């Protein structure tokens, strides 16, 4: 396919979870930078970044160091998932069948769907409150519908439109946050801007964990946005475009939140602090962030839809849905989330975020297994046809080795967890720091490798696997 033909690709995406033929690939690797840079300059990462100085009482310097370390570490895992896209040509969650089996992958896929539905619902509530904050005459429920409709339309149109919006958003939001930094730093209203807080190792670890988990949360759908790139796009270029875009964008947003709350008197809500600290530009900054929420939330809807379709296709293996099916599922999720968000109690977002944090615990072992399997064991060579078979083809319905490593990866995290839904005994000795994700990664990775390489079925799978690039039968 020539560049002109690729640029002429239809705006409305026709694929869902099926294999993307080499002739249908399009786009440039730099699109991944703009997608993840623009998508991460938004209220939620700003609020999360402020927690290091608000909740864990770090000063600005140590807060920034913790943010940078967490983003740098978590971004590696996130970008390694992204680099699988051009090599495989299929969405991330359906590719998990190669590790867990056609039925074994169902649990992880359902969890991913629930998590991204939760993200979508919580973000439309945030969008509704933002609309009300900008124009008080607009009720929050109306604002919720406005935010949901905007994200829903973007998600239904699909991949190409999402990339176009984020190419524009990178420039607009990049300039906006740069001006915002200048306004805050030139109008600091506190005498303790640099001295408020201090250094506490436990608080520093907790901030690193929050920062790293922000990146890891993208892992189940990050390659959904790189799978359309031409198959000759290398792993390294995909990795670096994603890594730099996501880590730079989210690091700027995290630091912006920390700077904003330190520039105003202690105790102020983060977004109120942003509005006050940026002075006359405050309302404009809120408008930019609202547009960012709407655009970025389309990724959550898109990822949720693909995960739901993947789950259903497990039991209807001959069904490779089209754009119409994707639109129908999008509308169902959209309506359900609007209904729940409008009719729920005031602590809806808080409860939803608590659930999402708990679900991250079960996604960390999946991340470890997926990356070890792709890069170390199979080295990117898979039988794509088997992934779409009812019996899993050479991968089977269940992979006991992956499921055992997965279960152990969850269990070992439990004592280290510190979420609103459950707190293990160890965080109390670490000042509340939740290191469960790190423990899960460090145990699951070598355990899965050890189990997989000693399994005779693994050798059969490896011998039968073919490169995605050479497979032309899946439509």
How would you name each of these model-derived features?
Residues 128, 142, 146-184, 198-199, ...:
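Membrane-interface loop-to-helix entry segments
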Residues 93-97, 125-142, 230, 300-331, ...:
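Helix-loop-helix connectors at the membrane interface of multi-pass transporters/channels
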Residues 327, 366-446, 464:
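C-terminal membrane-solvent junction of multi-pass transporters and transport-like membrane proteins
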Residues 109-113, 134-157, 171-182, 211-222, ...:
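Transmembrane alpha-helical segments of multi-pass small-molecule transport proteins
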Residues 171-197, 212-216, 255-263, 368-380, ...:
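Hydrophobic alpha-helical segments and their helix-loop junctions in multi-pass secondary transporters
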Residues 1-62, 203-209, 227-237, 455-475:
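Membrane-interface "cap" regions at the ends of multi-pass membrane proteins
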Residues 29-46, 181-187, 196-260, 279-301, ...:
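Hydrophobic, membrane-embedded alpha-helices of multi-pass small-molecule transporters
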Residues 262, 311-346, 394-413:
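Loop-to-transmembrane helix boundary motifs in multi-pass membrane proteins
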């Amino acid at each position: 396919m020539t560049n002109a033909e690729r640029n002429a690709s239809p705006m409305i995406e026709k694929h869902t979870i099926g294999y993307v033929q080499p002739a249908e690939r399009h786009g440039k690797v730099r699109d991944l930078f703009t997608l993840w840079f623009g998508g991460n300059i938004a209220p939620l990462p700003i609020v999360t970044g402020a927690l290091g100085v608000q909740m864990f009482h770090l000063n600005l310097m140590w807060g920034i160091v913790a943010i940078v370390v967490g983003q740098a570490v978590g971004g590696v895992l996130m970008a390694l998932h992204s680099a699988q896209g051009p090599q495989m040509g299929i969405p991330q969650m359906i590719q998990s069948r190669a590790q867990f089996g056609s039925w074994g992958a169902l649990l992880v896929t359902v969890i991913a769907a629930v998590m991204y539905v939760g993200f979508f619902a919580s973000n439309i509530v945030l969008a509704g409150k933002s609309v009300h904050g900008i124009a008080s005459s607009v009720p929050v429920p109306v604002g919720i519908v406005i935010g949901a409709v905007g994200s829903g339309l973007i998600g239904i149109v699909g991949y190409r439109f999402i990339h176009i919006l984020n190419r524009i958003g990178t420039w607009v939001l990049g300039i906006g946050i740069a001006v915002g930094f200048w306004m805050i730093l030139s109008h600091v209203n506190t005498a303790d801007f640099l001295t408020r807080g201090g250094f506490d190792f436990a608080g520093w670890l907790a901030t690193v964990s929050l920062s790293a988990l922000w990146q890891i949360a993208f892992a189940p759908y990050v390659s959904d946005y790189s799978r359309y790139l031409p198959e000759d796009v290398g792993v390294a270029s995909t990795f670096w475009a994603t890594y730099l875009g996501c880590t730079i964008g989210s690091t700027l947003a995290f630091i912006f939140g920390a700077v904003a709350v330190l520039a105003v008197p202690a105790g102020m809500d983060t977004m109120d602090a942003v509005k006050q600290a940026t002075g006359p530009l405050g309302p404009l900054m809120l408008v930019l962030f609202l547009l960012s929420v709407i655009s970025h939330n389309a990724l959550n809807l898109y990822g949720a839809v693909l995960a739901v379709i993947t789950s259903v296709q497990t039991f209807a293996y001959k069904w490779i849905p089209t754009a119409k099916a994707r639109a129908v599922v999008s509308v169902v999720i959209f309506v359900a989330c609007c209904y729940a968000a409008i009719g729920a109690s005031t602590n809806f977002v808080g409860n939803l975020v608590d659930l999402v944090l708990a679900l991250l615990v079960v996604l960390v072992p999946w991340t470890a297994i997926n990356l070890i399997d792709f890069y170390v064991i199979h080295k990117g060579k898979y039988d794509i046809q088997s992934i779409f078979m009812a019996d899993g083809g050479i991968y089977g319905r269940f992979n006991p080795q992956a499921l055992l490593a997965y279960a152990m990866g969850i269990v070992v995290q439990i004592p280290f967890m510190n979420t609103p839904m459950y707190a293990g005994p160890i965080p109390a000795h670490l000042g509340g720091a939740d290191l469960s994700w790190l423990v899960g990664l460090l145990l699951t990775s070598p355990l899965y490798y050890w189990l997989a390489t000693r399994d005779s079925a693994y050798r059969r799978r490896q011998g039968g696997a073919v490169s995605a690039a050479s497979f032309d039968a899946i439509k």
